[in-house]
């Protein structure tokens, strides 16, 4: 299954230890933020992209914690060199 460039970027951040946090107002999602492993906010996540990743089962949350990458997400993301 192919994933878009934006999905690949987000999954790569999550694979390196990042997380996606959501804030709700009632039952609706008010805000979505993607944090890198260093604590910086990555601006490339919107509601549509978040729902695509959930639909593909690439991310998951358990017990109300932030969303993390799943094994399926690791399979979908192509490896990239980390220039650190």
From Swiss-Prot:
> What Pfam families is this protein classified in?
YjhX_toxin (PF09857)
Q: Which residues cross the membrane?
A: none
Q: Which domain of life is it from?
A: Bacteria
Q: Name the family the entry cites.
A: Belongs to the UPF0386 family.
Q: What is this protein called?
A: UPF0386 protein NGR_c10980
Give the originating organism.
Sinorhizobium fredii (strain NBRC 101917 / NGR234)
């Amino acid at each position: 299954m192919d994933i878009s460039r934006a999905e690949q970027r987000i999954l790569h951040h999550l694979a390196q230890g990042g997380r996606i946090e959501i804030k709700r107002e009632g039952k609706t999602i008010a805000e979505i933020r993607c944090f890198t492993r260093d604590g910086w906010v990555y601006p490339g996540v919107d509601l549509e992209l978040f729902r695509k990743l959930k639909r593909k089962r690439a991310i998951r949350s358990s017990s109300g914690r932030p969303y993390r990458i799943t094994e399926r997400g690791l399979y979908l993301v192509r490896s990239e060199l980390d220039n650190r």
